[in-house]
From Swiss-Prot:
GO cellular component: membrane
Annotated compartments: Membrane
Keywords assigned: Glycoprotein, Membrane, Transmembrane, Transmembrane helix
Residue positions the entry lists as glycosylated: N14, N15
Transmembrane region(s): 90-110
Region: Disordered, residue numbers: 120-144
Keyword Membrane: yes
Lineage: Eukaryota, Fungi, Dikarya, Ascomycota, Saccharomycotina
Record protein name field: Putative uncharacterized protein YOR186W
Bilayer topology term: Single-pass membrane protein
Length: 144
């Protein structure tokens, strides 16, 4: 079973979508060959998704109007268009992981500097001079 990816051509004149059989991805009449690189597309989509997240928009459909001026044609490929939601989720996961590690480090630093009362009492050695004389006598009589 072979997976076939469909690419679309979006024309500026009548805003209609048509199927394209070649391996060329077209968006706003700009051609982007598939051999341009999947890694480069993923990196650009990751950067665009972070920009969208900082602007408070999680939908990649609005990417063209957010990033580019209407007079300047944008070069967002369909592959980057598909990757933006995944990259958005991944960027929020990394951000959450960073915050969790930061909170864990702060907690560990604070607990190492200021031990709790229970831990402090358990590790202290009670000096023998603080024991009453009666307790000393009781302990000596128990030994005999």
């Amino acid at each position: 079973m072979t997976l076939a990816f469909t690419t679309f051509a979006i024309s500026k004149i009548n805003n209609s979508s048509t199927n394209e059989d070649s391996k060329v991805m077209i968006l706003c009449d700009e051609h982007h060959p598939f051999e341009k690189g999947y890694f480069k597309s993923a990196i650009r989509a990751f950067g665009n998704s972070i920009k969208l997240g900082l602007m408070g928009n999680s939908r990649p459909e609005d990417a063209a109007s957010i990033f580019q001026d209407k007079n300047i044609p944008h070069d967002l490929t369909t592959e980057e268009f598909r990757l933006q939601l995944v990259c958005m989720a991944f960027s929020w996961f990394i951000f959450g992981l960073f915050i969790a590690c930061l909170l864990l480090c702060i907690t560990l630093v604070l607990t190492s500097r200021y031990p709790g009362e229970n831990e402090n009492k358990a590790t202290e050695v009670v000096p023998s001079s603080n024991i009453d004389d009666e307790e000393k006598q009781l302990s000596l009589s128990d030994m005999i």
